[in-house]
Amino acid sequence: MGILGQGNYSLTAGIIPDRVPYPLLENHLGNNFIFYNTNSFNMMRFFEFTSNRFFSLQYTQYLEGLITNRLPIIKKLNWRNHFTFNYLIGDLEERFNTNGALNSLNGKPYIEIGYGFSNIFRFLRVDFVHRLTHLNNTSTVFESNPPKFSIKISAQIRL
């Protein structure tokens, strides 16, 4: 992307047409830990949403110093900033949820955005992640609302 750095994306879609046992449905990957996971929805709780039809987009834009090089201290430390965008839409047909215990997106998108710094001590990464939708998501499994904001850390080596 030239001056904007490098972008990475992941598209996933799926349809489960026939009735199957619960473990074979799509249980979207959540992350309750303090560690950032590039392959999960980092503000979603484990087993929070289940779908038989879904589409997801996960996008990360590495700005390669576009903003941080304008700040002398950050430039000297060689930190890099990045932005993330995670989108998921899905649905669970009633025939898959006969007892009503499964929580579905019901066609309403799940969105989270994040920003952060990487290359801290050459391998650490810190992400600030915000959950934008499904903020009041209580069910029989979860008694409280999910968090709206979290700070996640991870280790990565980008050559």
List each language-model region with its residue ranges:
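Exposed, low-structure sequence patches enriched in small/polar residues
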Residues: 1-159
